[in-house]
């Protein structure tokens, strides 16, 4: 029952749904997701935490950066079924199509720059550490 309640709670927010749809294309850095959704980093992190708690997504840390992807076959059946259903329902929706176009531009113009503090808009502080 916990899985069902956690999944329905996670899907009850438009921004979390948008995050799931963005991850359909593969793994993304949290910085890229922040740029796509256009919310404060703390808000996006909270949404990602909710999705992760529901086991709809998985994350991995690489240095200072977190990367997220849709949950794999090891996720509970409830989570896998919910994600498959959701992505089917969202297919062709204007907001999701707009997000996909925006994400393409984000990935073209700053595949890793946002993660390293070099976003052209200046919305992120420059990283002074050499990498």
Segments (PLM) and residue ranges:
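C-terminal regulatory/oligomerization modules of transcriptional regulators
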Residues: 25, 74-131
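Beta-hairpin "wing" of winged helix-turn-helix
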Residues: 53-62, 69-71
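Short, structured secondary-structure boundary patches
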Residues: 48, 54, 64-66, 79-85
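N-terminal helix-turn-helix DNA-binding core of bacterial DNA-binding proteins
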Residues: 2-43, 49, 65-75
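Amphipathic alpha-helical repeat elements characteristic of tetratricopeptide repeat
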Residues: 1-2, 97
